[in-house]
Amino acid sequence: MTRDTSPQLQYLSGFGNEFASEALPGALPVGQNSPQKAPYGLYAELLSGTAFTMTRSELRRTWLYRIRPSALHPRFERLERQPLTGALGAITPNRLRWSPQPMPAEPTDFIEGWLPMVANSASEKPAGVSIYIYRANRSMERVFFNADGELLLVPEQGRLRIATELGVLEVEPLEIAVIPRGMKFRVELLDDQARGYIAENHGAPLRIPDLGPIGSNGLANPRDFLTPVAHYEETSGPVQLVQKFLGEHWACELQHSPLDVVAWHGSNVPYKYDLRRFNTIGTVSFDHPDPSIFTVLTSPTSVHGMANMDFVIFPPRWMVAENTFRPPWFHRNLMNEFMGLIQGAYDAKAEGFLPGGASLHGVMSAHGPDAETCDKAISVDLAPHKIDNTMAFMFETSQVLRPSRQALESPQLQADYDSCWATLPSTFNPNRR
């Protein structure tokens, strides 16, 4: 069972909807988007998340009715303190795994605490993904937007309050949040410190996958995605606005809060989703199905069925397959797999893969259950059992993921990762079937 939505905040339910919300009655114009004089003396502004001529089913855009237009800002200047560079490290085909990254010792807000892990695209390209681990121990006092891509946040420790232009989201571990490219927001900590994962999607916006023969229900159901209601800040005084542009941080100083949208309508919206609401699909006969049945969100490419990025989870579930090796099978994959763990243990790894940690299996890197897991799975008396108190996830992408220089030099990189398979025995006997 899952908990009820927090009563402190209101949300709009659904995925891909044309939403509408207003913090003041009558703030939304009726029958048009850009009237000569908008209600309450507001400015009309369009935020486009896709090209104008995309098909309607894929179009993402939102009209904002705000106290001051976003164009009201001075020149952006490059910040002296830059994020850790996402420069890619040496090419390696090896399987990699990292222990959890430590929390920062110095005061660090959300945008200061990104550690680049892997990437497969330069920020200026409209495809690919960059993956980070974030760590923070103080709330943001500034506002941020990312011109380089859509952000998928996966908290592992610490609750976050995310104040966006369209309203406020609160997320905790086992929930995720998605922030559209270019949307301004501020992250406040609801606990002393926070850590988690970020997928920066440079490609097509994320959407829920088609269900095919599963039917009209299952996996992540649209009604469980929650978008905030309109909420605005009317303040005066200096506010730093930071943008990430081609991997660099640039900033300007405003004399007002840029989170001043009084009303809005459209489909280019931030949202949250509770992973505990995922309707898991699995076999009720034999064999382990392909992990695509665990897809929560996908960013497609022009090649049908091949994703720019998939977000896949491995949630609590019953294992009932008969006469079956039940862990995820040994695999060599065309896709590239970056995995993280939010809580518990992953059923293919008995040890070494910890909450807050990560692993990378690149294209055609052989992987699968470790020796201990394999031995148990082969010899166990099969009976229905539940994998519980766990939540692993995977960012899977069709382009090769290369680790960053920081990730390769990190003390948390496990030098002995390959050893988890080293004791797999040969049990072949040509005289015994």
UniProtKB/Swiss-Prot annotation:
Gene3D superfamilies: Jelly Rolls. Its cofactor is Fe cation. InterPro entries: HgmA_C, HgmA_N, Homogentis_dOase, Homogentis_dOase_bac, RmlC-like_jellyroll, RmlC_Cupin_sf. One of its GO terms (cellular component) is cytoplasm. Keywords: Dioxygenase, Iron, Metal-binding, Oxidoreductase, Phenylalanine catabolism, Tyrosine catabolism. Involved in the catabolism of homogentisate (2,5-dihydroxyphenylacetate or 2,5-OH-PhAc), a central intermediate in the degradation of phenylalanine and tyrosine. Catalyzes the oxidative ring cleavage of the aromatic ring of homogentisate to yield maleylacetoacetate. GO terms for biological process: L-phenylalanine catabolic process; tyrosine catabolic process. CDD domains: cupin_HGO_N (cd07000). This is Homogentisate 1,2-dioxygenase. Pfam families: HgmA_C, HgmA_N. It comes from Pseudomonas entomophila (strain L48).
